[in-house]
Each structure stands twice: as structure tokens, then as C-alpha cells.
């Protein structure tokens, strides 16, 4: 699991069936100071997060289990909106 800031959204018309009805967001992984730590990624949103919000992102089986779809094409999922963080 890692913390990230949502920087954008992804619009798609043709997709793998398991992505139907899912909202994909562009997330920028950040450290405890809110500084960027690596390249942006795409994650499937499970909590209704919006651009500019800090979120927690899960990967792999943990991400797929959020949607109860163990065989889906989902690799990363936004699982929480961060209210605050401090170091």
C-alpha cells in the first residue's frame, strides 16, 4: 500500500470487460512530506476520490479483492481518501 495524490482521470471507450463501470484515476505516489517519489500510475477508484485529493492505493490481490473480482484486470485500487497526515 502507498500514499498518492490524484492528478487526473482516464477516459476510455474500449476496455477489458472487468473494467466496465470502473473509474480510473491517475495517481502520483508521494512520501510522508507530500513529495513525489516516482512516476505516475493509473489506479481504479473504489471510494469516489477526486483530483487533488491524497489517497491510499493497494496493489495486486489486495486491489482486486476490493472489487471482489479476483480474475479482473485491476492491478491498483484507490482504497481510502486521506484526511490528513503528519510526520
Q: Positions of the model-derived regions?
A:
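C-terminal structural segments of small proteins and small subunits
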Residues: 56-87
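Short alpha-helix capping/helix-loop boundary micro-motifs
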Residues: 39-43
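A structural micro-motif recognizing beta-strand termini
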Residues: 30, 44-46, 60, 82
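A short, acidic/glycine-rich surface segment
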Residues: 14, 38, 63-67
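N-terminal first-folded block
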Residues: 1-35
Amino acid at each position: 500500500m502507498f500514499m498518492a495524490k490524484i492528478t487526473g482521470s482516464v477516459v476510455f471507450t474500449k476496455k477489458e470487460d472487468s473494467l466496465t463501470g470502473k473509474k480510473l484515476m491517475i495517481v502520483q505516489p508521494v512520501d510522508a512530506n507530500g513529495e513525489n517519489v516516482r512516476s505516475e500510475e493509473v489506479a481504479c477508484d473504489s471510494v469516489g476520490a477526486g483530483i487533488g485529493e491524497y489517497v491510499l492505493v493497494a496493489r495486486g490481490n489486495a486491489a482486486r479483492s476490493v472489487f471482489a473480482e479476483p480474475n479482473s484486470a485491476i492491478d491498483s485500487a484507490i482504497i481510502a481518501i486521506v484526511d490528513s497526515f503528519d510526520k
